[in-house]
């Protein structure tokens, strides 16, 4: 155009949303006025997006997700004259920021792993993610239908399972979980594209060490337009370790060619895992040679940051229920005082469950006053169901805010949770929404205008969480401690945001010298709110940079994982036989025999404490068995089935071989029988160790 008279209109979020709806949704209502600032612009230029040479790295977490990329000079040359270059860091890691719409659009590097349904139009689903999803939930009324999903990462193990989606107008649709995960990840990629003004052809998405092949397969299927760095994809434990290795090289704090050993405890939002690593750094003429051997040592799929939040929620619910008419409920202060003992020794003697038995019993009784088990109300009225569901999410979110406030800032001694502003000495007031909590009065569920004020202090909170945290540390560390193996480790790295809590370090000192733990925590890390969450992402980006630019030749070897589960079955004499042993890399397969007439086998999954967690039913159809030579069976299962064990099968004997499968984090059952002297092989069946039938899910409506 010859006439260059341009104006840039700047407006707040409300006006922007209004204008967007007018343009996109054909609204019949046109406002009389719009408030905005007009800025004259001499000229503008529309540029195509750059093509990034570096992969976008994503740390897909149970509670929060982060993303980032390494930007070199070549990238900045393509952005010549773009104001974004004044914000981005040259030859450094750059993170994807997100707007926290609940806190005045403040920039944050953390995106909650949350998805909410905005609307369903002719089967088309519109989502909101992260902070926006949380904001919409907070804006909803108690009796409104709302659909929000947490803990998306846990869905990877059962990604084809259908979820029912409902919008506020009552429209319903079923969609597979993989589609929700895909939409969430595409949103993260879109935020990165917007930030860095470039398209990404390749991605690196870190995965848990125990389920890495499963994650890679799913990401390939749901993100087919991107090249997945599957060959160079680090699991979360190795990514954390590589960040440490990179810091050692940068600070010249390593001895050339020396073998180091490290333990990594990753306490995420939903699970906690223990990995071991051995690594050696050699400075060669053209690049560093880094050899890493890693192995999965232990894990607890039932423990993570959400467990600690749930403990705070238990205390909060009990405190509120007591003030709402539950006079027969025990005083929360008395329950907390009962924890003011040598709780570590109590856990050693009686276990974690025994320590919390009184609190769990009181919490169950509080359900009569302040209901949160919304699954029990699926056949009640719509209003009651959503009121109880809202109670759970409202209290759980308050508990999360309380936990974060105490452990991200060290100057809070006492906190009041109230829907009305309070000013008290040495007390921080956590303001919560009004008209959000419902309680049972005279058999009816009533909505409260304001919640009763609840108080909690840092001393009580530490007492409350000590047993849970020591229990998980003891589960991981006691075995190596008793075998005198801990002295071999020079580094112990704590990662995950929950590890900001000093109780982790206190519990570790029961087994490990504090100096080793200190060496794995960067000085001043307590001042960096998200540093522990970013360690995994930083390690992945540094690894990608070193590999892409040829700074390091990295060789990664994965040893056989140690399974934290036991698989057993009963013989015909009712004797229990262990088929897969826990934490024993040598005994990860076994077999048990039945008579040919009995083609059904029950298998029992137990945890490290010997508690039965799940029962598998394995049935065989004799019509599907085919004749096979023993050497062919041995070859088909890569030697996991020995020919001697096949030769031992007598006529009319059905032998079930149970083979651990690390790549899919489960086990395969292979039925073989001998009939009229001929071996016959039945179809094998795969079972996952971790299924929704027993894994704790805090958002399933049973808490």
Q: Can you annotate each of these PLM segments?
A:
Residues 65-69, 113-117, 272-277:
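Short beta-strand scaffold segments in enzyme catalytic cores
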Residues 263-277, 549-552:
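Metal-dependent DNA phosphodiester-chemistry modules and their immediately adjacent helices/loops
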Residues 1-99, 145-261, 278-301, 305, ...:
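N-terminal phosphate-binding loop and flanking beta/alpha elements of the actin-like ATPase fold
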Residues 1-13, 89-203, 207, 217, ...:
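Phosphate-binding loop and its immediate beta->loop->alpha context
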Residues 1-17, 25-37, 47, 474-481, ...:
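Terminal low-complexity/disordered tails
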């Amino acid at each position: 155009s010859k006439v260059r008279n341009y104006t840039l209109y700047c407006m707040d979020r409300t006006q922007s949303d209004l204008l967007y709806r007018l343009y996109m949704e054909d609204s019949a209502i046109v406002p009389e006025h719009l408030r905005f600032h007009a800025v004259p612009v001499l000229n503008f230029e529309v540029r195509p997006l750059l093509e990034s040479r570096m992969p976008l790295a994503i740390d897909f977490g149970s509670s929060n997700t982060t993303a980032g990329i390494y930007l070199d000079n070549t990238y900045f040359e393509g952005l010549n004259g773009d104001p974004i270059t004044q914000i981005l860091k040259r030859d450094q890691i750059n993170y994807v920021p997100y707007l926290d719409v609940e806190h005045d659009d403040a920039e944050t590097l953390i995106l909650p792993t949350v998805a909410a349904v905005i609307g369903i139009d002719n089967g088309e689903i519109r989502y909101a993610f992260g902070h926006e999803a949380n904001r919409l939930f907070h804006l909803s009324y108690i009796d409104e239908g709302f659909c929000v999903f947490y803990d998306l990462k846990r869905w990877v193990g059962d990604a084809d399972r259908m979820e029912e989606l409902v919008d506020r107008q009552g429209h319903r649709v079923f969609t597979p979980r993989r589609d929700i995960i895909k939409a969430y990840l595409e949103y993260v990629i879109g935020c990165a594209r917007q930030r860095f003004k470039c398209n990404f052809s390749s991605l690196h998405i870190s995965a848990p060490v125990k389920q890495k092949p499963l994650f890679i397969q799913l990401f390939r299927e749901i993100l087919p337009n991107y090249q997945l760095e599957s060959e160079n994809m680090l699991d979360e434990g190795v990514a954390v370790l590589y960040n440490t290795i990179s810091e050692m090289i940068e600070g010249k704090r390593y001895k050339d060619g020396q073998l180091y050993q490290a333990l990594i405890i990753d306490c995420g939002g939903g699970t906690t895992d223990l990995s071991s690593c051995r690594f050696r750094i050699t400075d060669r003429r053209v690049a560093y040679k880094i050899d890493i051997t890693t192995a999965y040592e232990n894990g607890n799929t039932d423990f993570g940051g959400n467990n600690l939040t749930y403990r705070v929620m238990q205390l909060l619910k009990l405190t509120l229920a007591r003030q709402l008419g539950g006079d027969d409920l025990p005083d929360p202060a008395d329950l907390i005082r009962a924890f003011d003992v040598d709780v570590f020794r109590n856990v050693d003697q009686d276990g974690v469950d025994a320590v919390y038995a009184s609190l769990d019993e009181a919490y169950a009784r509080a359900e009569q006053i302040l209901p949160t088990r919304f699954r029990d109300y699926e056949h009640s009225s719509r209003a009651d169901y959503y009121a109880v569901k809202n109670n759970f999410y409202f209290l759980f979110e308050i508990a999360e805010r309380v936990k974060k406030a105490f452990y991200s800032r060290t100057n809070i001694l006492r906190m009041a949770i109230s829907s009305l502003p309070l000013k008290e000495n040495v007390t921080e007031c956590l303001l919560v929404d009004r008209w959000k909590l419902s309680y049972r009065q005279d058999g009816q569920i009533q909505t409260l205008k304001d919640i009763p004020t609840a108080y909690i202090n840092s001393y009580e909170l530490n007492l409350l969480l000590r047993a849970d945290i020591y229990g998980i540390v003891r589960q991981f560390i006691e075995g190596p401690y008793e075998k005198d193996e801990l002295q071999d480790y020079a580094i112990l790295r704590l990662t995950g945001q929950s590890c900001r809590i000093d109780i982790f370090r206190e519990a570790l000192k029961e087994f490990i010298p504090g100096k080793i733990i200190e060496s794995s925590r960067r000085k001043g890390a307590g001042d960096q709110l998200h540093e522990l969450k970013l360690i995994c992402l930083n390690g992945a980006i540094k690894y990608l940079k070193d590999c892409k630019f040829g700074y390091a030749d990295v060789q990664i070897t994965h040893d056989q994982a140690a399974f934290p589960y036991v698989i057993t079955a009963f013989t015909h004499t009712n004797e229990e036989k262990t088929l897969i042993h826990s934490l024993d890399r040598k005994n990860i397969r076994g077999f048990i025999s039945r008579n040919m007439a009995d083609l059904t086998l029950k298998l029992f999954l137990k945890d490290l404490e010997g508690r039965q967690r799940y029962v598998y039913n394995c049935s065989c159809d004799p019509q599907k068995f085919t004749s096979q030579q023993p050497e062919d069976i041995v070859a088909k299962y890569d030697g996991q089935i020995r020919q001697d064990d096949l030769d031992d099968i007598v006529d009319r004997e059905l032998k079930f071989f149970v083979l651990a499968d690390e790549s899919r984090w489960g086990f395969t059952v292979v039925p073989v029988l001998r009939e009229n002297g001929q071996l016959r092989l039945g179809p094998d069946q795969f079972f996952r160790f971790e299924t929704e039938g027993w894994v704790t899910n805090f958002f399933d409506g049973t808490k």
